[in-house]
A protein has these predicted regions:
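Histidine-centered catalytic micro-motifs
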Residues: 1, 19-31, 142-151, 173-189
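Active-site Asp-x-Gly
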Residues: 2, 139-144, 160-166
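General secondary-structure edge motif
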Residues: 3-6, 121, 153, 177
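Non-catalytic, topology-defining segments of multipass membrane proteins
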Residues: 6-126, 191-196
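Membrane-embedded alpha-helical segments that form the functional core of polytopic membrane enzymes
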Residues: 6-17, 132-136, 165-176
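Transmembrane alpha-helical segments that form the membrane-embedded catalytic/substrate-channel core
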Residues: 15-19, 63-71, 128-155, 180
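N-proximal short alpha-helices
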Residues: 107-110, 114, 146, 150-153, ...
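Long, positively charged, glycine-interspersed low-complexity recognition regions
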Residues: 155-197
Length: 197
């Protein structure tokens, strides 16, 4: 499981140590202000009273334009050993070095992919390994449905989380995470078993 977690984290630009701890906090304090739930901000561009920022996340490739607000920037900061707010508030002190090392590995892999593209005179490595997440607007739609517009700062997942229905193809792509209340109530159940709950 851990190997696939590492691969999926790289594919989604989620540094795995940071993601493990921020996601644990997200399950404990869904839609909470204090402690801050970094995963329910809607997106890196979301601000509660700014409708433009809300809709801009659906523009394919927008994270390339707003790089300074992206998870890429956070990974680079961590790779440089800089402590971000999410690192301070979510990651235990004894795991921060793991986060820094993992971020350095991510940056090294990005550079290797770019180097391979230059050496082979082909954009294919970049198109296959670096850009797909930047154009995954459909996943953003599904992700935003999980908590947006629901109660904040409440411990009962039935009020801060929702499940939705997806067709079988989208359900496969989304790894059955449309069963999101079930995922929050039973986080250790593998995603393929969520429909059985």
């Amino acid at each position: 499981n851990d190997i696939f977690y590492q691969i999926a984290s790289f594919m989604n630009n989620f540094e795995p140590v940071r993601w493990r701890w921020s996601h644990s906090l997200h399950h404990s304090y869904t839609a909470s202000i204090d402690p801050h739930d970094f995963e329910v901000e809607g997106s890196i561009f979301w601000a509660p009273k700014n409708l433009f920022n809300f809709f801009i996340v659906f523009v394919p490739g927008i994270s390339l334009i707003f790089f300074h607000k992206s998870l890429h920037k956070e990974i680079i900061w961590h790779a440089l050993g800089l402590e971000t707010r999410v690192m301070k508030e979510c990651i235990p002190d004894d795991k921060k070095k793991d986060c820094i090392n993992s971020s350095r590995l991510f940056v090294a892999l990005w550079l290797v992919i770019i180097f391979c593209s230059i050496i082979f005179n082909s954009l294919l490595p970049i198109l296959l390994f670096l850009l797909p997440k930047c154009f995954a607007s459909l996943n953003m739609v599904w992700g935003l449905t999980q908590h947006m517009g629901l109660k904040e700062g409440i411990k009962d997942h039935r009020f801060s989380t929702r499940s939705i229905r997806l067709n079988p193809i989208f359900s496969f792509i989304y790894w059955k995470m449309e069963y999101h209340i079930e995922h929050h109530m039973f986080p250790l159940v593998p995603s393929h078993n969520l429909p059985k709950l």
